C-alpha cells in the first residue's frame, strides 16, 4: 500500500482513451511561463516528519507582504517511488487570501485559487482543479498567489505530504465530440462562461450538463479559472445532444478573459500584466492558433483583478453582459458602443457566469446563427458577431437591414451607396412590456414598445452612409439591483460598409460653427477649439442658443457621452469648454442626447437624455455656468413615465418662448412624440402625446427640433421613421395644426437625418437639415406660411457642400442665424 487516500478508480482497467503522459510532456513548454513570474517564497523554516505507510510530510512556513499583484512558489524535490502528493495550506483569512496551484517537472498540474485550502493528485485521481497523472521524480512547486490586505503582511503555512507506494493505474478521459450530428444552418443558443467544482463552482460537469439541458441550451463552454482539469474529467458522461466546448477563464490580476474552444488538456498561463510586453498577445495568438476565441470577461467590473487593463481591441469579443443585469454591464455596453463608433468590429457576448446551483445557466446567453452545431462553426459565428444576447430562451429578436434587394443580419455587412435608403427592422417576441431601441453611432434613432403578449416591431429608415452600423436593444423599464431598467436582449451590429474599406474617421466628426447674416449670406465655418489645447472637439451631437445681448451658447455631446458647454460673447472668440456634471451631480455622467434654448432674461435651459434613458433639465447662466444641477423632468403614465415619476426619452428638444416659459418635445420610450410646457414659475403641465399625420394616433421618429416665435407660437420639426421631415405649429392659444411634410427640391417631401429650426424677429422660421446624401441645406418658412426653396449650405471653404451628421440653429436679435453642427469631413 502507498498510504494514499483510497479512490474508486484506483484499480480500474484504463481501457481505451487518451492518456495524460504525452499531454504532460507538453507542459515543459508552459512551465517556463507559469513559474517565471513566481519568485521563491521567503521561508522562515521547513520541518519534515515521517508518518506510517510511507508518508513524509514537510511543513514550510513563510510570510507574504502586503499587496495584490504578486506570485510566489514553494519548491520541493520528489524522489522515485512517490505515487501521490497532498498539499494543505493554513493562514488567517483576516490577513488575506492564499491562492494555490501546482507545477511539476513536466509543467502545469493544477490550480484551485482561493477555492480550496488543500488538494491531492496522483496517477489515478486528483482533487478537482488538478490534473491526474504520473508523479515524476524531480523538482515540484506549490504555486502561491497571495492577496494580502494587512499592511503587516500575512504569515502562512504549506504542508506537502509525499505518499510512497507501487504505481497507480492511469484513468483515461473521453474526448468531447466536435459536433452534434444532424444539425445544419440555424440559430443556436449557448452559454460560454460556466464554472464547476474544478474551480469555484458548485456543480459537477454532470450537473452542469443537466442544468444546461433544462435551460434549453444547444451548447455550453466549461470555463473554470486557470485550469485545464475540467476537460480531462469526462469519463463515460459525454452528452450526445449538447455541444460542450472546452474553455478556461484566464484569471490574471489585471483582468479576466475566456479562452473558448481549447483542445482538452490545453492550458493558458495567467502570470502576467500589461507591463509584460507582448506576453498577453502571445497567449491570445496561442488560443487563436488552436482554433479558439479570446473574450474579455466582464471587463468594466471595478473589483480588483477583474477590471480590464490589457486593451479591449486585442481580443476577439467582449462579454458585455455578465449574469444578472447591473451597472457594470451598462458600462460594458457603453465602452463597446464607443468602439463600434470607431469602426472597430468586435463582437459583444452575453453569458451567465454561473457558479453555484442557485445561479441560472443561460441567463443571459448567446443566440448564434451558425452553419451547424459544431465547435468550428459556432466559434466562427461568434467571432463574426452573428449573434445576439438574450436573458432567457423565451426571448427572440429578428434583426435585419435591407437595401438594394439584399438583406443582412447581426455581424453581416450591407454596404450602402451614398444616396441609398436602408430599412432596418427588429421583430421581438417573448419580452412583455419592454422597449425596443435602435442605435447607430449617432445615438438612439428609433424606439418602439412591445405589448403584453411580448411582441413588438421597430422599423427605421436611414440614408446612405449616414451611419456606420445599426444595432438593437430590448429593455424592461423596471429597476434592477443597481440600474433603473433591465436588459432583455442586445444584438451585434449590422455594418453599412465593407470590412476592407475604412469607414470615415470618427475623429473627423468635429463640432463647427457658422453664421448666416441678415442678408442671407453665409460666413465661413469655424471649427470649435477642443479641450486643453486640442485643435478641435469631436462629438456626436450639437445644439446652440442665442441670448438677447448677442451671446451664443453652444452645447456639444462628446463621443464618450460627456456634455460640454462653451460661450461666445459678441465679437469674441469661443470661451473654454466646461464639462457639465451628470445626473444627480455626478462628475463624468454620460448622456444620449441634449439640446439648449436661450431665454429673454439671458439664461439658457438644457434638456438632456441621460444614459439610463431618463429626461433631465438644467438652467445655465449667460456666462455658461450651471445655476443648479440636472433634475429629472417629471413623467406620467400617459407619456411612458419611469419609476419614481421620471420621464423616459430617447431624444428631446427645447424652445424658449417670449414670456419666459419653455416648451419641450421628446420621443418617449413608448416610441411616440410628446410635448410639455415648463411654466414661468417652474411648474410643469402634463405631457401631451402629439397625433401623427393624417389622423394617426401618434408620431414616431428619429430626430426633432422646436422653436419659439415672438407671437407666442412654437414650430416643431420631426423626422419620421421613414426619413421624411414633417412640420407642425402650436398656436399661441394652445391649439395645433396637423403634421405636414416639408416639400423637397424635386420631390413632394424632403428626407433628412437631422433638423434644426429657429424663429427670427421678423416672424420667419429658419430651417436647416442634413439630407440623405449627408449634405446640409437651408430653407425659410415665411410669416405667411409659405416656404422658400432648399439651398445648400456652403462648405468650410465657402464653396461646395457642407457634410454633417447633426445640425442645430439659433437666432440672435440682429437677425443673424447661428449654426452648430457635427461635421463629418
Q: At which residue positions do the language-model features occur?
A:
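N-terminal secretory signal peptides
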Residues: 1-18, 31-33, 37, 43-45
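N-terminal export leaders
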Residues: 19-29
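An N-terminally biased module of ancient metal coordination in phosphate/nucleic-acid-related enzymes
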Residues: 23-24, 169-254, 327, 356-358, ...
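C-terminal edge strands of extracellular/lumenal beta-sandwich accessory domains
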Residues: 52-53, 102-105, 133-189, 210-215
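Surface-exposed beta-strand/loop patches in noncatalytic accessory domains
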Residues: 53-68, 90-127, 576-581, 628-634, ...
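Charged catalytic cores and adjacent phosphate/nucleic-acid-binding surfaces used
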Residues: 170, 174-183, 253-267, 303-501
Amino acid at each position: 500500500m502507498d498510504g494514499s487516500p483510497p479512490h474508486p478508480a484506483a484499480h480500474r482497467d484504463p481501457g481505451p482513451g487518451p492518456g495524460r503522459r504525452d499531454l504532460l510532456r507538453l507542459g515543459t513548454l508552459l512551465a517556463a511561463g507559469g513559474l517565471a513570474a513566481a519568485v521563491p517564497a521567503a521561508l522562515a523554516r521547513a520541518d519534515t516528519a515521517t508518518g506510517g505507510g510511507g508518508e513524509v510530510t514537510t511543513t514550510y512556513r513563510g510570510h507574504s507582504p502586503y499587496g495584490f499583484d504578486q506570485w510566489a512558489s514553494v519548491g520541493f524535490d520528489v524522489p522515485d517511488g512517490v505515487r501521490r502528493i497532498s498539499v494543505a495550506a493554513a493562514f488567517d483569512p483576516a490577513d488575506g487570501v492564499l491562492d494555490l496551484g501546482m507545477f511539476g517537472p513536466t509543467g502545469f498540474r493544477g490550480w484551485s485559487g482561493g477555492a480550496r485550502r488543500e488538494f491531492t493528485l496522483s496517477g489515478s485521481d486528483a482533487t478537482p482543479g488538478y490534473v491526474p497523472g504520473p508523479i515524476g521524480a524531480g523538482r515540484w512547486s506549490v504555486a502561491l498567489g497571495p492577496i494580502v490586505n494587512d499592511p503587516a503582511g500575512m504569515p502562512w503555512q504549506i504542508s506537502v505530504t509525499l505518499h510512497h507506494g507501487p504505481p497507480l493505474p492511469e484513468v483515461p478521459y473521453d474526448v468531447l465530440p466536435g459536433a452534434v450530428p444532424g444539425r445544419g444552418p440555424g440559430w443556436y443558443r449557448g452559454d460560454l462562461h460556466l464554472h464547476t467544482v474544478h474551480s469555484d463552482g458548485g456543480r459537477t460537469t454532470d450537473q452542469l450538463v443537466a442544468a444546461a439541458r433544462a435551460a434549453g441550451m444547444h451548447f455550453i463552454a466549461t470555463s473554470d479559472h486557470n485550469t485545464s482539469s475540467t476537460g480531462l474529467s469526462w469519463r463515460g458522461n459525454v452528452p450526445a445532444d449538447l455541444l460542450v466546448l472546452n474553455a478556461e477563464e484566464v484569471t490574471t490580476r489585471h483582468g479576466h478573459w475566456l479562452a473558448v474552444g481549447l483542445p482538452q488538456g490545453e492550458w493558458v498561463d495567467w502570470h502576467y500584466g500589461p507591463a509584460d510586453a507582448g506576453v498577453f498577445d502571445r497567449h491570445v495568438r496561442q488560443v487563436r492558433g488552436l482554433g479558439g476565441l479570446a473574450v474579455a470577461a466582464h471587463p468594466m467590473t471595478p473589483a480588483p483583478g477583474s477590471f480590464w487593463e490589457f486593451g479591449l481591441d486585442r481580443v476577439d469579443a467582449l462579454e458585455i453582459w455578465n449574469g444578472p443585469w447591473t451597472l457594470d454591464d451598462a458600462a460594458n455596453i457603453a465602452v463597446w458602443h464607443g468602439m463600434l463608433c470607431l469602426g472597430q468590429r468586435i463582437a459583444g457576448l452575453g453569458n451567465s457566469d454561473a457558479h453555484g446551483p442557485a445561479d441560472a445557466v443561460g441567463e443571459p446567453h448567446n443566440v448564434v446563427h451558425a452553419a451547424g452545431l459544431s465547435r468550428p462553426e459556432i466559434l466562427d459565428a461568434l467571432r463574426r458577431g452573428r449573434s445576439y444576447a438574450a436573458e432567457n430562451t423565451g426571448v427572440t429578436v429578428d434583426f435585419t437591414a435591407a437595401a438594394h434587394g439584399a438583406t443582412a443580419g447581426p455581424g453581416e455587412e450591407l454596404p450602402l451607396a451614398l444616396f441609398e435608403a436602408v430599412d432596418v427592422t427588429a421583430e421581438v417576441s417573448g419580452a412583455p412590456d419592454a422597449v425596443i431601441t435602435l442605435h447607430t453611432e449617432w445615438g438612439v434613432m428609433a424606439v418602439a414598445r412591445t405589448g403584453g403578449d411580448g411582441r413588438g416591431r421597430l422599423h427605421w429608415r436611414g440614408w446612405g452612409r449616414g451611419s456606420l452600423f445599426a444595432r438593437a436593444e430590448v429593455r424592461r423599464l423596471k429597476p434592477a439591483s443597481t440600474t433603473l431598467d433591465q436588459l432583455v436582449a442586445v444584438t451585434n451590429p449590422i455594418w453599412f460598409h465593407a470590412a476592407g474599406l475604412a469607414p470615415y474617421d470618427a475623429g473627423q466628426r468635429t463640432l463647427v460653427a457658422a453664421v448666416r447674416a441678415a442678408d442671407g449670406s453665409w460666413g465661413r465655418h469655424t471649427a470649435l477649439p477642443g479641450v486643453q489645447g486640442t485643435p478641435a472637439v469631436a462629438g456626436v451631437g450639437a445644439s446652440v442658443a442665442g441670448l438677447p445681448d448677442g451671446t451664443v451658447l453652444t452645447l456639444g455631446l462628446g463621443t464618450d457621452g460627456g456634455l460640454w458647454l462653451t460661450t461666445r460673447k459678441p465679437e469674441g472668440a469661443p470661451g473654454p469648454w466646461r464639462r457639465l456634471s451628470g445626473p444627480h451631480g455626478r462628475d463624468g455622467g454620460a448622456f444620449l442626447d441634449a439640446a439648449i434654448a436661450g431665454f429673454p432674461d439671458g439664461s439658457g435651459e438644457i434638456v438632456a437624455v441621460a444614459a439610463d434613458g431618463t429626461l433631465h433639465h438644467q438652467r445655465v447662466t449667460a456666462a455658461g455656468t450651471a445655476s443648479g444641477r440636472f433634475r429629472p423632468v417629471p413623467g406620467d403614465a400617459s407619456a411612458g413615465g419611469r419609476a419614481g415619476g421620471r420621464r423616459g426619452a430617447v431624444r428631446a428638444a427645447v424652445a424658449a418662448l417670449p414670456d419666459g416659459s419653455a416648451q419641450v418635445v421628446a420621443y418617449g420610450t413608448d416610441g411616440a412624440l410628446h410635448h410639455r410646457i415648463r411654466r414661468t414659475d417652474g411648474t410643469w403641465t402634463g405631457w401631451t402625446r402629439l397625433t401623427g399625420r393624417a389622423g394617426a394616433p401618434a408620431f414616431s421618429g428619429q430626430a426633432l427640433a422646436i422653436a419659439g416665435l415672438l407671437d407666442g407660437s412654437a414650430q416643431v420639426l420631426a423626422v419620421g421613421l421613414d426619413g421624411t421631415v414633417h412640420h407642425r405649429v402650436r398656436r399661441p392659444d394652445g391649439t395645433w395644426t396637423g403634421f405636414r411634410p416639408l416639400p423637397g427640391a424635386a420631390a413632394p417631401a424632403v428626407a433628412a437625418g437631422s433638423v434644426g429650426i429657429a424663429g427670427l424677429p421678423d416672424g420667419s422660421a429658419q430651417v436647416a437639415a442634413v439630407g440623405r446624401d449627408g449634405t446640409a441645406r437651408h430653407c425659410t418658412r415665411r410669416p405667411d406660411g409659405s416656404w422658400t426653396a432648399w439651398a445648400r449650405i456652403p462648405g468650410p471653404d465657402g464653396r461646395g457642400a457642407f457634410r454633417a451628421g447633426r445640425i442645430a440653429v439659433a437666432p440672435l436679435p440682429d437677425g443673424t442665424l447661428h449654426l452648430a453642427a457635427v461635421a463629418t469631413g
